[in-house]
Amino acid sequence: MDLNNKIFNILLPIVTVSFLLVFMPFSIFFKLLQFIRGCKESEKVNGKVVIITGSSSGIGEHLAYEYARRGAYLTLVARREDRLQVVADRCRKLGSPDVAVVRGDVSVIKDCKRFVQETISRFGRLDHLVNNAGIAEAKFFEDYSEISDVLPIVNTNFWGPVYATHFAIPHLKKTKGKIIAVASPAGWSGVPRMSIYAASKAAMINFYETLRIELHPEVGVTIVFPGLIENGNTNPDLLAEKQDWSQVVTIESAAECAKAVVNGICRGKTFVAEPSWVRVLFWLSAICPELLISKPKRN
């Protein structure tokens, strides 16, 4: 190890801790001011146009209802068109002036291009792109008999949002709009039996962190970290996993989560953790990852 690295190894931790001790009070005060300002100057989405992927159930469905209550025009995207029609009907009753339903798979490039184009053709603009579509599977990595079986998870959770974002950016720049990425605390720290899901969400988080810098100030980026949410998933392995976690934390309804998320988006937050205690997992994984390590049980 050369002398420069030795010096950095000694000095940087000391300087960093000292800086944080001085900076943190100012940071907390600044965030408090931002919160107060956000409450007073919350974005009004009445008359704005919003695309929501994965909106046939779970958080995506209730995000659609929340935007509808606030008077937004909606494009709902998912693979189950029959369910989308049901959600769309309720959105109209809740106050959305018009709702477009587009059957599509976000892991398919041409589908992403199509639902963005159809939105512009119908509404003439785009203000919010909500990348919510995602899939999960509770499985030990070594239990995959075919490694290609992991591709649907990665393609939907990471590449899907990337594709949709690529086609949406030119339109979002015109309206100074926002990109919303529904990620997961699993992207911060490892979750046993969900290695591929966690990796796809970690990639998603880092992509949008970088994109926020590249697009600032023309387009805003909000990354969402939902906790344990009741989303109607019927996968038995995922239900068992959720049941294990529910012994430790409370499962929040998708409706409550969606309301908090849209509030955060409209206040211009860069991150929305719901419930808010979820952000503690980030600090634990960064400062003391040993606390999050436990031997997973095999069924």
Swiss-Prot record:
Sequence positions that bind substrate: S184
GO cellular component: membrane
Residue spans crossing the bilayer: 10-30
GO BP terms: steroid biosynthetic process
Keyword Transmembrane part of the UniProt annotation: yes
Active-site residues, record numbering mapped to chain: Y197 (proton acceptor)
Broadest EC class assigned to this enzyme: oxidoreductase
Keyword Oxidoreductase carried by entry: yes
CDD domains: 11beta-HSD1_like_SDR_c
GO MF annotations, alphabetized: oxidoreductase activity
Keyword entries, A-Z: Lipid biosynthesis, Lipid metabolism, Membrane, NADP, Oxidoreductase, Signal-anchor, Steroid biosynthesis, Transmembrane, Transmembrane helix
EC number: 1.1.1.-
Binding-site residues, NADP(+): 54-80, 105, 197-201
Protein topology in the membrane: Single-pass type II membrane protein
Compartments in which it is found: Membrane
PANTHER family recorded: 11-BETA-HYDROXYSTEROID DEHYDROGENASE-LIKE 4A-RELATED, RETINOL DEHYDROGENASE-RELATED
Family: Belongs to the short-chain dehydrogenases/reductases (SDR) family.
Listed name of the protein: 11-beta-hydroxysteroid dehydrogenase-like 4A
Native source organism of the sequence: Arabidopsis thaliana
Gene that produces this protein: HSD4
